[in-house]
Design a protein with these regions (language model features):
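Terminal connector regions
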Residues: 77-106, 141, 147-189, 268-302
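Surface-exposed binding patches on compact interaction domains or structured appendages
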Residues: 32-40, 76-141, 226-243
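Membrane-proximal extracellular "stem/stalk" segments
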Residues: 189-313
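Sec-dependent signal peptide cleavage junction
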Residues: 20-33
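C-terminal membrane-anchoring or membrane-association module
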Residues: 319-342
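Beta-sheet-dominated interaction scaffolds and their linkers
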Residues: 39-73, 77, 85, 131, ...
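Short proline/glycine- and polar residue-rich coil/turn motifs
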Residues: 58-60, 131-140, 247-256, 283
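Bacterial N-terminal signal peptides
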Residues: 10-21
Length: 342
């Protein structure tokens, strides 16, 4: 019988714990059976000591020394510790587990801080990874060295330090193998930070029975607590597909396609409106596109619709302008009349 492997990943980012089980994201409070725990040890570069992850203020050319503590459980275990680039995945969730080639598929630029080559773990001379063995009930602090390039300034990048426990020989003999992994965010910022809210919202892959939107962040800006919504409606306002994320994080230089939840299949020869809106605090970005389905069922994006101007607001402005002109005319007329009497 083919063994089924399930990966449980703890993503310590902001205040929640995200467990990835069979590729699905589930909120949880523990990982029963993991047989270990891990925690980042914060130091002087930390911008906020109340967080459970690293957010460091660094300088170009600087070398940072961190530590992560691993507390082993009741049996001897082998751990793989890795450093990876963080990405926003198609579920609008931060993923710290991807290797370099896979992570770059979700980025609009690869000219970022290199978490695979500039981070050294333990005494390993090879960057990006380290394997250790801990005896039962053993605790150990593992050093992490980060080399900041001299040219790296006014930037921000986000990666993650992953601690994965390998399956024991006993677990390997079972039909269901659980692999447990804890991942902690590692955010590096240097110099002045851009606080603007600027992401590209466009149509992704469009078919009659499945659609997606494309989100791109071309800047070195970490967009936290971003609300994302999208709908496809016909001319009568009937909803065909939608997407609604109440909050998510967009990593710097993100490039992701997010699938919509299809309620009805698009019909041949019909027109639809795709509306995409991203909101962060009091800032909102919105794009609207006209979709046309031809007689062969091919969906085409014909144009980006410009938001209609508020006509009532325009009338108010015209009215105020007319009053201003009229008032100025009265003042000039009165002034001339008084001069004539003199």
């Amino acid at each position: 019988m083919q063994k089924k492997i399930i990966t449980h990943s703890l993503l310590f980012f902001v205040t929640f714990l995200c467990v990835i089980t069979s590729g699905k994201n589930v909120l949880a409070q523990d990982i029963g059976g993991a047989d270990f725990s891990a925690r980042p040890i914060l130091e002087k570069h930390q911008t906020n000591n109340k967080t459970g992850y690293w957010w460091l203020d660094v300088k170009p050319g600087e070398e940072i020394n961190l530590e992560i503590q691993i507390n082993n459980g009741k049996q001897k275990n082998t751990f793989d510790i890795t450093s990876n680039q963080a990405v926003t995945n198609p579920n609008f969730v931060i993923d710290y587990s991807l290797k370099k080639e896979e992570a770059h598929k979700y980025l609009s630029s690869t000219k970022l801080f290199d978490f695979y080559n500039n981070v050294f773990i333990g005494d390993s001379k090879n960057p990006g990874s380290k394997t250790i063995v801990l005896q039962a009930d053993e605790s150990k602090k593992i050093p992490i060295k980060i080399k900041i390039p001299a040219s790296w300034k006014n930037n921000i990048s986000i990666g993650g330090i992953n601690v994965t426990r390998r399956a024991t020989e006993e677990e390997k003999g079972q039909s269901l193998v659980n692999i447990y992994s804890s991942a902690f965010a590692l955010i590096l910022q240097s110099g002045r930070q851009d606080d603007s809210f600027s992401v590209s919202l466009s149509a992704g892959d469009l078919k009659t029975d499945e659609q997606s939107i494309r989100l791109q962040n071309y800047k070195d800006i970490l967009q936290e607590k971003t609300k994302l919504q999208a709908t496809i409606k016909d001319q009568k306002g009937t909803l065909y597909s939608s997407l609604d994320y109440s909050s998510g994080t967009i990593v710097p230089n993100a490039k992701i396609d997010l699938p919509l939840n299809v309620k009805k299949e698009l019909q041949k020869g019909k027109e639809y409106e795709l509306s995409i809106m991203a909101t962060k605090e009091d800032k909102t970005l919105k794009e609207t596109y006209l979709l046309k389905v031809d007689d062969k069922g091919k969906v085409q994006v014909t144009s980006a619709l410009k938001p209609q101007k508020n006509k009532s607001f325009q009338l108010i402005l015209l009215g105020l302008a007319a009053l201003a002109i009229g008032g100025a005319g009265i003042i000039i007329y009165g002034t001339k009349k008084r001069k004539g009497k003199k």
